[in-house]
């Protein structure tokens, strides 16, 4: 969700497939594209409640809603809470939960196992949460002191992306680890934020209006196989992002994967060089000032974003990398599920050749520049999050 909870997008690549029937409820259908007139967070606090907004994949949104809206109606009735997932034929949607703090946590405990956003062996649970940009600064603290305290207290990974979601004043907080630890982070965040009024204007993120696949690595959104050349539904460019946090500079990549048929060993030089490829990815930002880089967070080292998808078009090229043969199963996954997921999320064609008794296997990646970057990053994370990868290369994500 964003809580934003991370979700894998399987079978929801086309706008038609991603657009569910209006099974949220009648209210969602009639009001799903209305821009909110009030600040829901402040209104909830005034009523003694708390509003949590989760960024979830379209597939996970379907799991929250359930067939015919059955599950979302159950949540509302069982917990006497406001739960809403407005329609949007984009790869991501926003799930809003409003209730007292204890009830919010109970709803999340109910919902998290249903989500399909999590695929890391290391982190069985991952959540993405939308927070106002002024709250993001408070949660990071001076020189990163507050966010470090939260990580240590709850024994969970935690990151806040530097960029605002398109057309909004929202930033994405992402946390992962054991479910109880993730819920602990969320509980601590609620305790902190209920005492801090929002500063400045508040413009909530509305994926139906503003989703922009070219910016997902900047704000922490979900990739999807959108039509080349721009956002879905021919809406044109997303509006200018309001109140965006300080941008990071582009991050260059090492050359562990070469294009045009060349090969390079997965183990050549530093393991992290696996990120190599056709050059810097636009918007793949480093950490903001006051947010110290730290190995052991989400995404690439130094907080350089969290995944990025197919994006726009461009010339199709090929990249190759060799990996130790015994890591092939780690990339393929049970029944081919893991490599299928990477193909789905990156939009690239990925072929893993047979080892034929050789110590190394060749992975061929074909697609646009951004698709190749996305596939490289997801493959790297797949290996680094696996038990074999950690044993071989050391360290943690």
UniProtKB/Swiss-Prot annotation:
Tissue: Expressed in gut, muscle, neuronal and hypodermal tissues. Highly expressed in the germline and oocytes.
Gene Ontology MF annotations: mRNA binding
Low complexity: compositionally biased ranges: 224-241
Disruption outcome: Temperature sensitive with 35% embryonic lethality at 20 degrees Celsius and 80% at 25 degrees Celsius. Of the surviving offspring, 30% are sterile at 20 degrees Celsius and 76% are sterile at 25 degrees Celsius. The majority of non-sterile animals have a reduced brood size. In addition, animals have gonadal formation defects and display a bursting vulva phenotype. Reduced number of miRNAs including miR-58 in embryos and L4 larvae. Defective neuronal cell fate switching, whereby fewer ASEL neurons adopt an ASER cell fate in an lsy-6 mutant background.
Keywords for this protein: Cytoplasm, Nucleus, Repeat, RNA-binding, RNA-mediated gene silencing
Biased composition (Basic and acidic residues): 16-30
Gene3D superfamilies the UniProt entry points to: K Homology domain, type 1
One CC-aspect GO term: cytoplasm
Compartments it resides in: Nucleus; Cytoplasm
SMART domains assigned to the protein according to its UniProt record, in alphabetical order: KH
Domain KH span(s) in chain numbering: 49-111, 124-189, 316-379
One GO BP annotation of this record: embryo development ending in birth or egg hatching
Region (Disordered): 1-41, 220-279
Short name of any one Pfam family annotated for the protein: KH_1
Function: RNA-binding protein which functions together with alg-1, a component of the miRNA loading complex, to modulate the processing and activity of specific miRNAs such as miR-58 and let-7 to regulate gene expression at the post-transcriptional level during embryonic, hypodermal and neuronal development. Promotes the lsy-6-mediated repression of cog-1 in uterine cells. In embryos, may play a role in the DNA damage response.
Subunit structure: Interacts with alg-1; the interaction is direct and may be strengthened through RNA-protein association.
Protein name: Heterogeneous nuclear ribonucleoprotein K homolog
Source organism of this protein record: Caenorhabditis elegans
Lineage of source species: Eukaryota, Metazoa, Ecdysozoa, Nematoda, Chromadorea
């Amino acid at each position: 969700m964003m809580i934003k909870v991370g979700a894998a997008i399987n079978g929801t690549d086309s706008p038609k497939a991603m657009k569910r029937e209006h099974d949220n409820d009648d209210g969602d259908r009639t009001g799903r594209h209305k821009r909110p007139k009030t600040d829901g967070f402040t209104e909830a606090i005034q009523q003694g409640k708390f509003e949590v907004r989760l960024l979830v994949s379209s597939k996970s949104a379907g799991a929250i809603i359930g067939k015919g809206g059955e599950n979302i109606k159950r949540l509302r009735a069982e917990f006497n809470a406001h739960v809403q997932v407005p329609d949007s034929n984009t790869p991501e949607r926003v799930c809003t939960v409003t209730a007292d703090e204890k009830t919010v946590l109970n709803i999340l405990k109910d919902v998290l196992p249903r989500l399909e956003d999590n695929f890391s062996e290391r982190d069985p649970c991952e959540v993405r949460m939308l927070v106002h940009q002024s709250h993001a600064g408070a949660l990071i603290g001076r020189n990163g002191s507050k966010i470090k305290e939260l990580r240590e207290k709850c024994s969970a990974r935690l990151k806040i992306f530097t960029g605002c979601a398109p057309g909004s004043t929202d930033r994405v907080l992402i946390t992962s680890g054991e479910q109880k630890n993730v819920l602990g982070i969320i509980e601590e965040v609620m305790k902190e934020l209920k005492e801090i009024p929002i500063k400045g204007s508040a413009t909530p993120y509305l994926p139906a209006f503003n989703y922009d696949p070219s910016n997902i690595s900047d704000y922490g959104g979900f990739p999807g196989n959108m039509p080349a050349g721009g956002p879905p539904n021919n809406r044109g460019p997303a509006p200018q992002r309001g109140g965006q946090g300080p941008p990071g500079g582009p991050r260059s990549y090492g050359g562990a994967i070469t294009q045009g048929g060349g090969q390079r060993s997965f183990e050549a030089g530093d393991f992290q060089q696996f990120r190599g490829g056709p050059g810097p990815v636009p918007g793949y930002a480093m950490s903001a000032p006051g947010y110290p880089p730290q190995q052991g967070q989400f995404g690439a080292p130094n907080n350089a974003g969290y995944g990025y998808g197919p994006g726009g078009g461009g010339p199709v090229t090929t990249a190759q990398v060799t990996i130790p043969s015994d890591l092939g199963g780690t990339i393929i996954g049970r029944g081919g599920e893991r490599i299928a997921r990477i193909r789905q999320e990156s939009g690239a064609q990925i072929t893993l050749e047979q080892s034929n008794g050789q110590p190394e296997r060749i992975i061929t990646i074909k697609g646009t520049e951004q698709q190749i970057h996305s596939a490289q990053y997801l493959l790297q994370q797949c290996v680094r999050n696996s038990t074999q990868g950690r044993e071989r290369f050391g360290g943690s994500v």
